[in-house]
């Protein structure tokens, strides 16, 4: 199920408060404004619906998936604590979105910028900090061409 921002963030906060660790994935569509400008908002809406379907296929049933607004989405995957465990999930996400079929796009591939941060069960910071870490990674990913993911590394992890 795709949660709205309020519902999804509340569920993630509850998971963090209960000591549940996991991977927080934040992503948005590259050049979404260009899709709306060149193909129309109706096609942009179809892209968002297709992304919602692709995201639901990528993540597990117990994962918390949310649309934050506009072209920004997020997911929290309980029990995935490392880059090694998270990379295959992120690769599936990118591949699933790139292979979406939106006929009105005439074969154009939709790319996403992805930021990933991990929350360990013994971490003691807020959802806002977790979001900030993933958001800074999404910003770094936007600097590349095409779909790209950046993983947050906490200095304390080294």
Where are these regions (language model features)?
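Catalytic core regions of nucleotide second-messenger enzymes
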Residues: 67, 97-113, 142
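Conserved long alpha-helical elements within nucleotide-processing catalytic cores of c-di-GMP signaling
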Residues: 1-23, 30-60, 66-70, 74-75, ...
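Inter-domain helical "communication" segments and dimerization helices
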Residues: 84-86, 96, 100-104, 145-158
